[in-house]
UniProtKB/Swiss-Prot annotation:
UniProt superkingdom: Eukaryota
Protein's job: Export receptor for importin alpha. Mediates importin-alpha re-export from the nucleus to the cytoplasm after import substrates have been released into the nucleoplasm.
Major place of residence: cytoplasm
Keywords carried by this UniProt record: Cytoplasm, Nucleus, Protein transport, Transport
Residue ranges constituting the Importin N-terminal domain according to the UniProt record: 29-105
One GO process term, biological-process aspect: protein import into nucleus
Primary gene name: Cse1
GO-annotated cellular components: cytosol; nuclear envelope; nucleoplasm
This protein's name: Exportin-2
A GO molecular function held by the record: small GTPase binding
Taxonomic lineage: Eukaryota, Metazoa, Ecdysozoa, Arthropoda, Hexapoda
């Protein structure tokens, strides 16, 4: 693809089409760009378009976003597999040559996207493959151009912010040191220069805005560079930085004050970041920070007292309160808070004002209920005043429990008295009281169980009976909706503390609130019902089973479905999750409702498929459908055809229209339906019409499709291998196997597919391909020997030995390369088999290795005989030692990195709990692998009496003792 004017115009046209609201215009353009992005010069063409000043800015921004997403998808894709690099080497070098300069002279809208692209490239290439990046950036500090400097700082922030969350490692330390050696001093010099410039330009509002914007970014970079450990340079220059932070907290620049009450200005952002920085130091480096502590506590306190309740200050106040919480939690700073007068002032001037619901919060409650819910019960309120005030209350009540009890008790009484005087006017006082009690009493808990540890001084069940239940019993469910929501949340949060009796009395009231007009109220009602129904007792039995639910079942199910018809709740995830949970608890007792529920669920699926926009709702919708299939088909297995009749048209529409968000779910649902048919005869024709499409390479390029597709293909193999053979599709399946085995992320799926082929496909045809299959396994072993792959290949070969024979395996392997079987034993089985983590896999390996030892003559041949005692030694280790924990060994486990917020977007695979595949134990007849070893060795010893003692002689005495123990337990002899 040449960089020509004609190609630039063509690319611009397609980018404009990707912005269309019409999917018939947008999707073809997206697909075309996706199909051309692997051509050489494609990214260079994009960069040229972004740099073209004459081009429409909307198109340039679309190009910048497309470039960033291209980098996300492709820059590191080859690291996952042994496939070719998707980006030509010359393009990589050109990108790294052009991008920094292009970013720095681009408008802000483009700069942000390009900066993100730099940080993604830097994550993989910096510093080893891109060492000049830092020097190139630091050089620009001397340019004197504020916008260029801010561009560099934005890039540094994007590049280094992963230091905040990555796990510690030697490689990470080395990278941070590389950065500090080049960046720490220039950053400190820049801080001092910018602080000086605030005085030089004190009468130039435009310049001050850019200068203070620079300081915000300087502080963000400082935070990232200090997140892992305290660098020596910053410790040596702590006075410079802390002095600047004090000045920044005190800075009051009239020209930078904003008239807007909602959006924070640059000063608010600056102070919030300062509070975040000093919070980090107070938490992690309190010894070095100690000399500055009182000065900062005073500065933050003064800032809090004079800061108004406007929304624009929320992040600042939140971080300031977090700082006070950290200080109050440190024993050697607690003297600051021990004075009862100071505690009373904190409660009066800081805690209560920030616990109160504000007009802006009420506005969000009414107009943006989803945002309110996210903040209030989903934990996205990390930067809200209420959350920070609650955390401060919790910290103070833990560390100064007796002193704070009296102070908070007085406030609580005052708030409740005020409410009683005039509920219609003073309902906000009770809302504050509920929040105060919640944060005051809470000591610890989990998302799954709610609050599980509380203060003994706060009588929660009594407060619930006197203050919460009366609110829920009010006849008008639409009265005081904010207060209703707070009361429902109280029940939900303290469900593990209140006990089954109290909850049983609350349950009908919660169900009664499902039709409430307020989205927040009926969402909270659904959410609390779901969480209460999820509760289990000490024996893991459901606390509220079908018998307890029986009086309310009709009202519950009809109420939940009716809620989905309320304005704004057509795709309410809490309601759909509650429907799922209700059916899960009811099981067969849900059958009377299926006649109404199933058509409604199918109708909802048809509607949401047109525009999938609520991932959580969609997930629980599919969960509910999968659960319904299991409940109904458990009662009547022939009902599967009714489900197929209802759902196939919808599924076919989803697949034909390439609705990528739903495909992983559709493949799981098809697997469930097909597995339900096992043993009932041939696979119906509609499945076979779909089968060739399942082998399409494009489907397998989407990571979210891989696991459910492997399961679906395996179901076809299990029930229809003869038909697959007749269709001549084995080569297509083997192509998928080859793709899976080449991938570090998906090699386990390749092994799973291969096991199914060997188990259910006609042996004669699969045997002709075995040499090629084994060759691919050894090729991957030599190219990329990851711990997960080693585990997979050991399990697979053990399975092969059990299914066929060790002799057949040894002969086939040695045909590929002489003595390769011995290398497999020596370098893979003997050294690695003890590291396999899962019990069922360890059993498979134990039985397979036992058969190698006792039923495989090849291992007794001269060139392999020395491996026999070593293999037995490793097998005993497998039995006697716990599995070693290995990075990235478990499927889905991430090796050594925290979740990466910059990872490229792809529809992920989300396993449906109610569509889990049945676990198959290939060795159900073998109850104890140790006894199987003992019995097998006993037979082997009898058959080869003279040979056996020679083979066993190199084994250490303690291992022989363990072996004797196995024999005693099995009641057999080996000597």
């Amino acid at each position: 693809m040449e960089v020509t004017e004609a190609n630039l115009q063509l690319l611009a046209g397609y980018l404009q089409q990707t912005l269309s609201a019409d999917p018939n215009v947008r999707r073809p353009a997206e697909k075309l760009l996706e199909s051309t992005e692997l051509q050489q010069n494609y990214p260079i063409l994009l960069l040229n378009l972004i740099d073209k000043a004459q081009m429409d800015m909307t198109t340039r921004v679309a190009g910048a976003i497309a470039f960033k997403n291209y980098i996300k998808r492709n820059w590191a894709a080859h690291l996952d597999s042994d496939g070719p690099d998707r980006i030509h080497e010359s393009d990589r070098n050109t990108i790294k040559t052009l991008i920094v300069t292009l970013m720095l002279h681009s408008p802000v809208a483009l700069q942000k996207q390009l900066s993100d692209a730099v940080s993604i490239i830097g994550k993989y290439d910096f510093p080893k493959k891109w060492p000049q990046l830092i020097d190139e950036m630091v050089e620009r500090f001397a340019s004197g151009d504020f916008n260029v400097i801010n561009g560099v700082l934005q890039t540094a922030h994007s590049l280094f912010k992963r230091y905040r969350y990555e796990f510690k490692s030697q490689a990470l330390w080395e990278e941070i040191k590389f950065v500090l050696d080049r960046m720490a001093k220039p950053l400190t010099d820049l801080l001092q220069a910018k602080m000086q410039l605030t005085k030089v330009h004190e009468n130039n509002a435009g310049a001050l805005k850019v200068i203070y914007g620079s300081l915000v970014l300087v502080n963000k970079v400082f935070f990232s560079l200090n997140s892992q450990d305290l660098p020596e340079f910053f410790e040596d220059n702590i006075n410079t930085w802390m002095g600047a932070f004090i000045q920044q907290l005190a800075a009051d620049v009239p020209s930078l004050r904003t008239a807007d009450d909602e959006d924070a200005g640059v000063l608010e952002h600056l102070r919030a970041q300062v509070c975040e920085n000093i919070c980090l130091y107070a938490k992690k480096y309190d010894e070095e920070f100690k000399p500055f502590m009182e000065q900062f506590v005073t500065a933050v306190w003064e800032l809090l007292v004079k800061t108004s309740l406007h929304t624009k200050y929320d992040s600042l106040v939140s971080h300031a309160l977090q700082f006070l919480s950290v200080v109050a939690d440190r024993q050697h700073y607690q003297s600051i808070f021990e004075n009862p007068e100071i505690l009373a002032q904190i409660c009066d001037k800081v805690v209560i004002p920030n616990l109160d619901i504000r007009p802006s919060d009420e506005e969000i409650f009414e107009d943006s209920p989803e945002e309110y819910i996210r903040r209030d019960i989903e934990g996205s309120d990390i930067d809200t005043r209420r959350r920070a005030a609650c955390d401060l209350v919790k910290t103070l009540s833990i560390n100064f429990e007796q002193k704070i009890f009296g102070i908070f008790g007085q406030y609580l009484e005052r708030l409740l008295t005020k409410y009683k005087e005039n509920p219609a006017t003073n309902w906000r006082s009770k809302d504050t009281a509920i929040y105060l009690v919640t944060s005051w009493a809470s000591r610890g808990g989990t998302q799954k169980h709610g609050i599980t540890q509380t203060s003994e001084l706060v009588p929660l069940p009594e407060f619930c009976a006197q203050q919460i239940i009366p609110e829920l019993e009010r006849p008008n469910i639409n009265e005081f909706p904010v207060l209703k929501a707070a009361a429902i949340k109280y029940v939900m949060v303290f469900r593990s503390i209140l006990g089954p009796q109290v909850l049983a009395s609350c349950l009908p009231q919660l169900i009664r609130h499902l039709p409430a007009e307020s989205s927040v109220v009926h969402s909270y009602a659904a959410c609390s019902v779901e969480k209460i129904l999820s509760m289990r007792d000490a024996s893991n039995a459901i606390v509220f089973g079908p018998q307890i639910l029986a009086p309310y079942t009709t009202e519950l199910i009809s109420g939940l479905f009716a809620t989905l018809s309320l304005p704004g709740s057509g795709e309410n995830e809490y309601v759909m999750k509650a429907i799922m949970r209700s059916f899960s608890v009811l099981q067969s007792a849900a059958m009377p409702f299926m006649g109404v529920a199933l058509p409604r669920l199918t109708e909802i699926l048809t509607q949401v498929a047109k525009n999938p926009s609520r991932p959580q709702f969609n997930h629980y919708l599919f969960e509910t459908l999968a659960l319904c299939i299991k409940i109904v088909c458990h009662a009547d297995s022939s009902a599967v055809s009714s489900f197929e009749e209802a759902l196939f048209p919808v599924f076919q529409g989803i697949l034909q229209q390439d609705i990528v968000e739903f495909m992983p779910y559709v493949f799981q649902m098809l697997s469930v339906l097909l597995e339900m048919r096992e043993g009932t005869g041939t696979i119906p024709e509609p499945y076979w019409a779909l089968f060739p499409c399942l082998l399409s390479p494009a489907l397998w390029d989407r990571t979210g499709n891989v696991t459910p597709l492997i399961r679906l293909i395996s179901a076809f193999i299990k029930q229809g291998s003869a038909q697959i053979q007749a269709l001549g599709k084995l080569s297509g399946i083997l192509g998928i196997f080859q793709k899976m085995i080449a991938s570090k992320a998906n090699d386990h799926e390749g092994f799973y597919l291969l096991q199914n082929l060997l188990s259910y496909y006609p042996p004669a045809e699969i045997q002709t391909n075995l040499r090629q299959i084994f060759g691919l396994l050894f090729q991957r072993l030599s190219l990329s020997k990851t711990p997960k792959y080693l585990s997979g290949i050991i399990i697979f070969f053990s399975f092969y030995v059990i299914k066929f024979s060790g002799s057949q395996m040894a002969q086939l392997i040695d045909e590929i390369q002489p003595n390769l079987f011995g290398m497999l034993l020596d370098r893979v089985f003997i050294t690695e088999m003890g590291k396999i983590p899962k019990e069922q896999d360890r059993k498979m390996v134990a039985v397979g290795v036992t058969k190698l030892l006792t039923e495989t003559p090849e291992i007794l041949q001269q060139q392999y005989a020395t491996f026999w005692p070593r293999l037995l030694h490793s097998l005993i280790d497998l039995f006697e030692r716990p599995p070693e924990k290995l990075m990235g060994l478990e499927i889905g486990e991430t090796a050594g990195v925290a979740e990466d917020p910059d990872a490229g977007y792809q529809v992920a695979f989300a396993q449906l709990t109610h569509a889990q595949p049945n676990q198959q134990d290939h060795l159900a007849e073998i109850k104890d692998a140790r006894q199987f070893l003992a019995t097998s060795l006993s037979k082997f010893a009898q058959a080869r009496a003279g040979e056996f003692s020679t083979l066993l002689s190199p084994l250490e005495p303690e291992y022989k003792q363990v072996l004797q123990k196995y024999c005693d337990q099995a009641g057999v002899r080996i000597a």
